[in-house]
Amino acid sequence: FQQGIFVAEEIAGLAPRVIDEKAIPRVTYCEPEVASVGYTEEQAKEKWGADNVESYEYNLGGNGKSQILGTAGFVKLVRTKNGGPIVGVHMVGARVGEQIGEAQLIFSWEATPEDVAPLIHAHPTQNEALGEAHLALAGKPLHAHA
């Protein structure tokens, strides 16, 4: 709906803030769900160079709620190297569309894994997977499985 607000404000002459299309969350409602925001790893490498991008894929096998639900999937984080921010979050799994709001904030606020890692995520929830992925990319893996 932000695009509609943009158009209405533009027509009204209010000089609205330009919408960052990369910051619009994308969700495919299927089983399992697919959700993402920001750049894919390939897009990030094209924009910042392959040597300046790193990623981490957290397997939902390490997430207690996913084990309870009997579901599988992953959370993939893409960041720029040398302390750079998260530039993409990609998730596959049951109910991941419900997590994309936090991922959108992380991307839009240019948060680093080190910014997100100390934040507490409720247990047991699938949302913990987003926190665990940031812990791992920040060099502090907890329930990460290779």
List PLM regions with ranges:
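Acidic, glycine-rich loop-and-beta core segments that form the ion-binding/anion-interacting portion
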Residues: F1
